[in-house]
Regions:
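Anionic-ligand binding region
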Residues: 180-212
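Glycine-rich phosphate-binding loops at beta-strand->alpha-helix junctions
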Residues: 70, 246-278
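Glycine-rich phosphate-binding loop and adjoining helix at the ATP-binding site
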Residues: 85-109, 113-121, 127-181, 221, ...
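Low-complexity, polybasic segments enriched for Lys interleaved with small residues
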Residues: 2-53
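Short glycine-aspartate micro-motif
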Residues: 61-65, 119-121, 182-186, 256
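Short beta-strand scaffold segments in enzyme catalytic cores
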Residues: 71-75, 126, 173, 191-197
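Short glycine-rich, Thr/Ser-proximal phosphate-binding strand/loop in the N-terminal lobe
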Residues: 56-102, 133-135, 200-229
Length: 296
């Protein structure tokens, strides 16, 4: 009996193969995206760094230079280095104490907000004693005697401690070398003077109103109004004469000449005489707070 082919079984097998091959292969999964690397947290300033920054801010001083024609201010550090822009406005004329305080408060407000100074130094164009004004010849008002200007300004500026001396004395603090007798002459709206011995400020000498020539005081002889009237050439001769008078009067080891008109000097200065930048009126404010005492 001839053997029968298992056609049914083979057909079903072929059908199974076709069925399997007809199925699509499963789609390959895309590799999982790596999570972005986390940035390490920013390091906080160390306690020592924070204290150093606080000390730096605590050393900041608002230095104010009151002149007969301009009010100037800047923030300085304990070494007298300027740490802010220098701001300036014209001095009001006539200028009462209240007008001056108002003008200064407006002038320095941006510096206070941005730099947070801890103290205030003031150079004033007149005789100052114990933070009070005794004379203010270039401010055009007679109501200045005994005015507690430092306290008035402190009251307007949040109670910050304030020290105030004559403006020529502030310039001298920035310029002096601290050896021997050093004298300061400032040439601006008027003539200012200051005397130092071994770096220490001596009692104030107000030579500006002392007669020097034909009944004219220093202010009237070499002040800015006198320069404008006489011309720079004659004015230079007058300043040269004053240097000789001061040498005989004070017998200084060094004479420093400051103020806005010091830049107008054209003659050769003696070896022991030097001109200083007008910025000294700001920079010297730092030494008002140095531990070394200053005599009234």
């Amino acid at each position: 009996m001839p053997t029968r082919k298992a056609t049914g079984t083979k057909a079903s097998a072929r059908s199974a193969v076709k069925s399997v091959s007809a199925k699509k292969a499963p789609a390959k999964r895309a590799p999982a995206k790596k999570a972005p690397a986390r940035r390490p947290p920013a390091k906080r300033a160390s306690a020592a760094g924070q204290k150093a920054a606080a000390r730096s801010r605590g050393d900041r001083i608002l230095a104010i230079d009151i002149g007969g024609t301009g009010l100037k201010a800047a923030v300085i550090d304990a070494d007298g280095q300027i740490k802010s822009e220098r701001v300036r406005v014209p001095t009001p004329h006539p200028c009462t104490p209240d007008q001056l305080v108002d003008a200064l408060a407006t002038l320095v407000e941006p510096l206070l907000v941005q730099h947070h100074p801890a103290r205030i130094s003031i150079g004033f164009p007149g005789v100052v004693r114990n933070n009070r004004v005794l004379t203010a010849p270039h401010l055009g008002d007679e109501g200045w005697r005994g005015v507690p200007l430092a306290a008035m300004l402190a009251g307007r500026l949040g109670g910050l401690p304030v020290r105030m001396i004559n403006d020529a004395e502030v310039q001298g603090l920035a310029a002096i070398e601290g050896r021997g007798i050093e004298f300061v002459l400032t040439l601006g709206t008027g003539a200012g003077t200051a005397l130092f011995r071994d770096g220490e400020l001596m009692p104030h000498l107000e030579l500006a109103h002392h007669p020097v020539s034909k009944g004219r005081a220093y202010d009237e002889y070499i002040g800015d109004a006198a320069r404008a009237k006489a011309g720079d050439k004659r004015w230079n001769k007058r300043v040269e004469k004053i240097i000789g008078i001061l040498a005989a009067l004070v017998n200084y080891d060094k004479l420093w000449i400051g103020g806005g008109n010091a830049a107008r000097l054209t003659f050769d200065l003696p070896a022991n005489v030097a001109a200083v930048s007008n910025a000294a009126g700001i920079e010297g404010g730092a030494k008002l707070w140095h531990s070394r005492s200053m005599r009234e």
